[in-house]
Amino acid sequence: MFGRTYYCGEITEKAIGEKVVLKGWVQKRRDLGGLIFIDLRDRTGIVQVVFSPEVSKEALNVAEKVRNEYVLSVEGTVVAREEGTINPNLPTGKIEIQAERITIINEAKTPPFVITDQTDVAEEVRLKYRYLDLRRPVMFRTLQLRHRVTKAIRDFLDGEGFLEVETPILTKSTPEGARDYLVPSRVHPGEFYALPQSPQIFKQLLMVAGFERYYQIARCFRDEDLRADRQPEFTQIDIETSFMSQEEIMQLTERMMAYVMKMAKGIDISLPFPRMSYDEAISRYGSDKPDTRFGLELVDVSEIVKNSSFKVFAGAIANGGQVKAINVKGAADQYSRKDIDALAEFVARYGAKGLAWLKVEEDGLKGPIAKFFTEEEQNGLIRTLEAEAGDLLLFVADHKTVVANALGALRVKLGKDLNLIDETKFNFLWITDWPLLEYDEEDGRYYAAHHPFTMPVREDLPQLETNPEKVRAQAYDLVLNGYELGGGSMRIFEREVQEKMFRALGFTEEEARKQFGFLLEAFEYGTPPHGGIALGLDRLVMLLAGRTNLRDTIAFPKTASASCLLTEAPSPVSEQQLEELHLVVNSEKKSEQY
């Protein structure tokens, strides 16, 4: 074999006349009777190789045996393509290689799907043969983008004086948040490690240790129900700083994101990012992670309709609820009664009991509920919703949470269905002024809105144990195009405040000591004020790559059932392994192994 001199996708007209050596995979082979054309592919792209008897009968004979995905080494001369054969869709489309020698490095079975960007093969097949799926150029480009993003983050933070420090993967299980992945200890029978849901406690301990500026491209693990933008193991950009204010951390994050966008995508973004309070986001968009690339904002019309004869609206308001509406501009003729019924079924998934509607015509409002509103009420709706002839008004009446969830989801659906979203935009947004705690009706207790180490707003501290739902957090989330990129906060750094927080979350003194005693003790040794942020790398790459599935940004992802179709993990283990770990599997359906 002979050493490579060029990558396939990097040969240009400047190389015409040169002898080159290429290595790669056969993308396509065409036999034109006496001439064979092979599209040779490597990670940089494709180049056309021509085998002819005039140049080398021996090479032509070998080329006749070649099939798709064979691995080849080819030596030949770069020549210009003839007029009429130029391919403007290829960077190498003006040249081709006249092959003089060819070596079949390895043969290949016929793949279960064609190795091209466009494929309609089931995702399960792609995941089972992930090594073939990753040959598709679109997959390589996505992972190449991931590399550029990660490199840009490291370069930026290094320039800001941050140290990359690795924290433990085998750690202690804590009860907050999602379920832990547990790892049994062989040397400590009946005891378990947990895989980290985040490096949260360790990065705070690094601040106690005086490192001041830490970051890590951290692997994290959560045993939770999955969806398209979740994975059981994921990667986050983890940052922690001492002696910096919330404002300074947010500005640092903005500068980092601007650097990443420039280095990874060649895009300039404007700073600072817009900011919106949590309450405003819920009020205007029905979401704490709003997509601001399009309108369709929620408008509260409760005051206008509270005394109307439409009992659904009046009753909801009388019971402490609200009525909100979305004005879908110019959509009155686009939605039939059947279409609106389908939208009603959609909002029902989010708890809404119905979807009321009105169409705006030149002489007023029309629709099944129009008769219940006086002329003054109709004019009030038209004025408040800035409605014009041809608009479609959609209403939900219920408790505030149901209204926000239902109309927030409907807003996103309408934005997609009506092509209102500018897919070329990257709209970053800070969500601030979060509640510190959230009350769970089922469990009858409070949970941390972010995590138990978030610092409350100082002036709200006296209410932490008496009126916890009123306490605000020094927390901030970064949103991009309707996705939560990540969240950050100032951290509790005083033992007394941390103990108050644990009590508000329902921990007994003994439980807090058992779970977090080491952290509470650390706070007694001169802990600096500190804060940070964690951003989802997988999700960031998904958005920058224009993908809709998180699995497309990870080399070897898990399915929605947290399994790996390639390696067939998780899998049973031997009886001997279980004995060494002091474990017994309690299952009616045991594998034959057991």
From Swiss-Prot:
InterPro entries: Aa-tRNA-synt_II, aa-tRNA-synth_II, aa-tRNA-synth_II/BPL/LPL, Asp-tRNA-ligase_1, Asp-tRNA-ligase_1_N, Asp/Asn-tRNA-synth_IIb, AspRS_core, GAD-like_sf. Its EC number is 6.1.1.23. The record marks 84 as: Important for tRNA non-discrimination. It is found in: Cytoplasm. Aspartyl-tRNA synthetase with relaxed tRNA specificity since it is able to aspartylate not only its cognate tRNA(Asp) but also tRNA(Asn). Reaction proceeds in two steps: L-aspartate is first activated by ATP to form Asp-AMP and then transferred to the acceptor end of tRNA(Asp/Asn). One of its GO terms (cellular component) is cytoplasm. GO terms for biological process: aspartyl-tRNA aminoacylation. It catalyses: tRNA(Asx) + L-aspartate + ATP = L-aspartyl-tRNA(Asx) + AMP + diphosphate. This is Aspartate--tRNA(Asp/Asn) ligase. GO terms for molecular function: aspartate-tRNA ligase activity; aspartate-tRNA(Asn) ligase activity; ATP binding; catalytic activity, acting on a protein; nucleic acid binding; transferase activity. Homodimer. It comes from Geobacillus sp. (strain WCH70).
